[in-house]
């Protein structure tokens, strides 16, 4: 393959809220060999205390989000816990064109849409699972960003999402962040670098 024809791969990472997606991704994102970068999602939810606009998410109003949908500026979008989340197309394709391997940390609903749109050879999909629902609930509580009602909604949603894990190429158990990150790193070295 000629150098000019090379393009990056999309790495879809999903899992229930609180499973540790960001924690695991943060441990592998700086592996130089893998040439990884984040796709920054757009959301209507309010930022958490440590989050920055344009870094963690593009935080927008409901009106701005709906405008992006109408203009066809999102690869996918989904509604979760009364908030909308979506993947802006323009930046995603720019990064892939620069031969970057782009991590899409997205909800199951959004991942399904992306997999329906993309060519099969352009992505791999990975689903993170918790050791148990009890542990997932504990993680959501200690995160201390959700009300009891929101946690209840997220657990209910997690039970539905966990039933869809076999629709992904790989499943990683996150019982220990370091071990889960090592498994993710191994998968990426094997499946992303082999395509280069």
UniProtKB/Swiss-Prot annotation:
The gene is gmk. It is found in: Cytoplasm. GO terms for molecular function: ATP binding; guanylate kinase activity. InterPro entries: GK/Ca_channel_bsu, Guanylate_kin-like_dom, Guanylate_kinase, Guanylate_kinase_CS, P-loop_NTPase. Residues 8-189 form the Guanylate kinase-like domain. The keyword Nucleotide-binding applies. Its EC number is 2.7.4.8. It catalyses: GMP + ATP = GDP + ADP. Essential for recycling GMP and indirectly, cGMP. This is Guanylate kinase. GO terms for cellular component: cytosol. Pfam families: Guanylate_kin (PF00625). The keyword Kinase applies. Keywords: ATP-binding, Cytoplasm, Kinase, Nucleotide-binding, Transferase. It is an enzyme of class 2 (transferase). ATP binds at residues 15-22.
